[in-house]
Design a protein with these regions (language model features):
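Gly/Pro-rich hinge or "lid" segments in bacterial periplasmic/extracellular proteins
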Residues: 182-242, 246
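A bilobed periplasmic-binding-protein/Venus flytrap-type ligand-binding module shared by bacterial periplasmic
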Residues: 232-236, 291-316, 320, 329, ...
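Ligand-site clamp/hinge motif
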Residues: 207, 227, 235-280, 293
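Surface-exposed binding/hinge segments that line
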Residues: 107, 141-201
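Aromatic- and charge-enriched surface segment that lines or borders ligand/interaction sites
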Residues: 93-144, 177, 307
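Detector for C-terminal structural segments
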Residues: 12-19, 24, 321-348, 392-399, ...
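Append "and occasionally in soluble cytosolic enzymes with long acidic Gly/Pro-rich linkers
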Residues: 309-402, 406, 491
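N-terminal lobe/hinge region of extracytoplasmic solute-binding protein
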Residues: 48-99, 130, 214
Length: 537
């Protein structure tokens, strides 16, 4: 049973309503509050986003909405710098990486407490890591795809995938040592993910983190319903609170309705601007902010379906799809066609990519010589949602399905509401669907942010079992930064394109529209904006 199935939306919201040689040191500190007597912020701010979180614990959930809520309430040892994405001090003031790159010693910030009054100390850090380790070792299906499992390669039932996590030691109240079995190059960047933010040990013991977050962040949870999550500024926050006293994250699945809500003043901003809304917003002089492409949309090919065990069939799928037309007509301007799963910003584009270009006749020829015999293939796609990698999935499905049908595929459309467990359905190991529309949004600045969740294990999102490919992905993650690592990722991208575990479609741009109240919106390519950094007029 997946996490979403184990703890449904109705239960979550009911419960949430109840609880209100190398040595590197962190530098550049986030400011602490000028004084506890400073008046708390009074402004209210309402952001409309596309879906409700099915739970609040980012260590279990991978949705953008869960991360958006948790980023306001919880904090990690390190945070991503807004300008560079590089790790910067947060709950850890500084750190030192051992010469063999197999341990990091963190010095923790003093005088920080959780929202429930519990002291933040080394024991609290260990309690969180112990919880994450136990989750990754759980037999639950969702555990294979939680961030701790994919980052540390931990808990896989496959003996070919070995963990790089060795444990956390408490040296003293303000010092913890994170130990690895082997080097993991992007470790500090990976720890900036919302999934590695600290919850109160009391909430961990109570097992309530998925219903009521208790962290050290600038906001605390006030209430949650299927329509809205409300957060209040935490007056005893150790850092800068900013100008927002009440933050509401309102669920509005339809992009046109989100746009209308902004134009009528019901909300102050909304995420994931729909394709048809850019012109109306421009006519009204509404500011639209664009994120850099840091996601990939793809057409999933279920390898457990017999037809897709044939490489010719998989290549026929790619040749049938006009990915250039998709990127141009169904995504915002600035979206790039994807020939690989890793975005261009890392400069690891393969030198010999094998994804076929749009060629319907070639697709027909491949099908004719393949093992496919016209059997109907179930095509699962989400509806009533927008994602950073798939803003209008119904329209994407319509175009792709028409192109596949024209070259000879027989399809059975299977639409499914996102909030009714779509992500579970496409991630189920024994699912009987053949095609699925999905994607992945990068959560930290490294190619492994894409490779690990998609391809590091047979239980990864693409569900592709290739021992050599898995070994190469996991080896590249530990290589020191430099030309050799860059070359390894280029080779990996070439190899993935040859095997075609799925069809990469695009690296989409996503956009946020903001009202005239907003002076400075803390836009992030990952979507993990911190609203205490928001500046209002």
């Amino acid at each position: 049973m997946t996490a979403e199935k184990a703890f449904g939306r109705r239960t979550f919201f009911a419960a949430a309503g109840l609880g209100l040689g190398l040595s590197l040191s962190g530098c550049g500190d986030r400011s602490t509050r000028s004084g506890a007597s400073a008046p708390p912020p009074q402004a209210s701010f309402v952001l409309a986003h596309a879906a409700a979180p099915t739970g609040l614990d980012p260590s279990r959930r991978t949705s953008q909405e869960t991360s958006r809520v948790s980023t306001q309430v919880l904090e990690g040892l390190v945070a991503a710098d807004r300008s560079t994405g590089e790790p910067s001090p947060a709950l850890a003031e500084s750190w030192v990486v051992a010469d063999d790159r197999r341990s990091v010693t963190f010095t923790l910030r003093e005088d920080v407490t959780f929202h429930d009054g519990t002291e933040f100390d080394a024991a609290a850090v260990k309690a969180n890591f112990d919880k994450w380790q136990a989750q990754a070792e759980s037999p639950e299906a969702w555990a294979r795809q939680c961030a701790f499992a994919t980052t540390f390669r931990h808990g896989s039932p496959d003996p070919r995938v070995s963990t790089c996590y060795a444990g956390v030691d408490v040296a003293d109240e303000r010092t913890v040592v994170l130990r690895l079995t082997r080097p993991y190059t992007p470790l500090l960047s990976a720890l900036t993910q919302p999934a590695f933010a600290m919850s109160s040990p009391e909430s961990i013991r109570a097992g309530t983190e998925d219903q009521h977050l208790v962290g050290t962040g600038p906001f605390r949870l006030d209430s949650a319903t299927p329509e809205s999550v409300k957060l209040l500024a935490h007056e005893d926050y150790w850092g800068e609170l900013g100008s927002v006293g009440t933050l509401e994250l309102r669920v509005v699945p339809d992009p046109e309705v989100r746009c209308a809500a902004l134009l009528t003043g019901e909300v102050d901003a909304y995420d994931l601007v729909g394709l048809d809304d850019f012109a109306p917003l421009a006519r009204e002089g509404i500011q639209v902010l664009y994120r850099d492409p840091y996601a990939v949309s793809y057409l999933g090919l279920n390898q457990r379906v017999r037809a897709f065990q044939d490489l010719d069939v998989r290549r026929a799928v790619a040749a049938a799809i006009d990915r250039g037309s998709l990127a141009k007509s169904l995504y915002p301007n600035g979206t790039n066609v994807a020939d690989q799963f890793v975005p261009a910003r890392f400069n690891v584009n393969g030198d010999n990519l094998q994804i076929p270009g749009y060629d319907p006749q070639h697709a027909k020829d491949l099908l004719k010589k393949s093992s496919y015999r016209g059997e109907r293939l179930r095509f699962l796609y989400p509806r009533h949602t927008s994602r950073m990698y798939l803003q209008e999935p119904e329209r994407v499905y319509a175009q792709i399905s028409a192109q596949l049908t024209r070259v000879g595929f027989r399809l059975q459309p299977v639409p499914m509401d996102w909030d009714e467990g779509y992500l579970d359905a496409v991630s189920t190991p024994d699912g009987d669907h053949a095609f699925s529309l999905l994607g992945w949004s990068g959560s930290f600045r490294d190619p492994d942010s894409f490779m690990a969740p998609l391809l590091s294990a047979p239980q990864a999102r693409l569900g592709f079992d290739d021992a050599g490919l898995m070994t190469a992905v996991n080896r590249a993650a530990g290589m020191p930064q430099g030309d050799a690592r860059t070359s390894a990722y280029k080779t990996l991208n070439d190899r993935v394109s040859e095997e075609m575990p799925a069809v990469p479609l695009s690296h989409p741009v996503s956009a946020v529209a903001v009202s005239s109240r907003v002076v400075n919106y803390p836009l992030s390519s990952t979507g993990f904006e911190r609203f205490n950094d928001l500046e209002l007029a």
